[in-house]
Design a protein with these regions (language model features):
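Non-catalytic alpha-helical scaffolds and adjoining flexible linkers that form interface surfaces
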Residues: 1-22, 27-270
Length: 270
C-alpha cells in the first residue's frame, strides 16, 4: 500500500456491513473522525483470515472515494494495522477502560466534513488524537508490567482530557473566596462553580463528596497541577480514588453540556 496518500487513525468502533464488510469510525491523526467502509473487513474467507480491524488499533488505509460529497463516509479496499495492543485484551478491567477512552473521543471529536479535515495539515484538533493514542499506549504498557490500577489510569486520562478540551480548572485559586490553594488544602472540584472550592465555603452535600483519604496525602488540585506540567507517559506516583474520578468526569460533562449517563461504558468502571 502506498504511503503517499494513506490516511492513519485509531479505530473507534466497528459494525458488520453486508456479508464481508465493516463500517468503522476512525479518529484521524488530526483529531477529526471519519466513517469508513472497509471492504472485506470482517476477514474470514477460504483461508479464514482474521480481521486486522480491532478497537484501539492504529490503522493505515487508502480512501477509494467518497460515498457522500460531504465526506461523511469513505470507502477503502486497502488497509493495514500500524500498531496494536496485546496486553490490554488480557485484562478485563483495562479493556473496559480502553472502551471508555474510545467512547469519550467518539463523543468529543468533530466529524470530518471536507477535504481539509482529512489532511494532517488540519491540526486544530490534533490534541484529541494525542490524548487517545497516549492513553492506549500507556494502558498497554502498565498492563504488560502488571501495574494496572483503574483509578490512576482513569484519573490521568480525565485530567489530560480537560486540558485538550479547554476546560482545565484553575488549580491554584478557590473560586468562591479567591484564596490561594495550598497542596494540603481540602478542596472540591465544583462543576457549577467552574473550579475548586475550599471546604469551608462548600454546602454540606459537597463537603460529603470530598475524598479525605486521598486529599490528606496531596489535594486533588495539586495532583491536577502536577499532571498538567508533565508528559502523559512521564506521569508517576500519582493516585486517584474512584470518587475523585467521578468528580473529574462530572466536571467535564458539565462543561461539555453532557451527562455521565450519556456514556454507556462509564457504568462498567464506576
Amino acid at each position: 500500500m502506498s504511503n503517499k496518500n494513506s490516511i492513519e487513525g485509531i479505530l473507534l468502533n466497528k459494525i458488520p456491513f453486508k456479508e464481508k464488510n465493516v463500517i468503522g469510525h476512525v479518529l484521524l491523526r488530526n483529531g477529526h473522525k471519519v466513517s469508513v467502509v472497509f471492504y472485506g473487513g470482517q476477514g474470514g474467507g477460504k483461508r479464514h483470515i482474521g480481521s486486522t480491524l480491532q478497537l484501539g488499533y492504529l490503522i493505515s488505509f487508502l480512501a477509494s472515494g467518497t460515498h457522500k460529497s460531504s465526506f461523511e463516509m469513505l470507502g477503502s479496499n486497502e488497509y493495514k494495522e500500524k500498531w496494536h495492543h496485546e496486553a490490554i485484551t488480557t485484562n478485563v478491567k483495562a479493556y473496559y477502560l480502553m472502551c471508555f477512552f474510545i467512547e469519550c473521543l467518539e463523543k468529543f471529536s468533530p466529524l470530518a466534513t471536507n477535504a481539509h479535515d482529512l489532511s494532517e495539515n488540519s491540526n486544530e484538533q490534533v490534541g484529541l488524537f494525542r490524548l487517545l493514542s497516549n492513553a492506549i499506549f500507556r494502558l498497554e504498557k502498565v498492563c504488560h508490567e502488571k501495574s494496572y490500577e483503574t483509578g490512576t489510569e482513569l484519573g490521568l486520562f480525565l485530567t489530560k482530557a480537560m486540558i485538550e478540551l479547554g476546560v482545565f480548572p484553575n488549580s491554584r485559586i478557590c473560586e468562591v473566596s479567591g484564596n490561594i490553594l495550598k497542596d494540603s488544602d481540602l478542596a472540591y472540584l465544583s462543576a457549577e462553580k467552574g473550579g475548586f472550592v475550599l471546604e469551608q465555603f462548600l454546602e454540606a452535600e459537597d463537603k460529603r463528596l470530598i475524598d479525605r483519604t486521598m486529599s490528606s496525602k496531596i489535594g486533588l488540585h495539586s495532583r491536577l497541577e502536577k499532571i498538567s506540567r508533565s508528559q502523559y507517559a512521564e506521569v508517576k506516583n500519582i493516585e486517584f480514588s474512584l470518587n475523585e474520578c467521578r468528580e473529574l468526569f462530572k466536571f467535564i460533562c458539565y462543561q461539555q453540556h453532557m451527562s455521565p449517563s450519556d456514556f454507556k461504558t462509564y457504568t462498567a468502571l464506576i
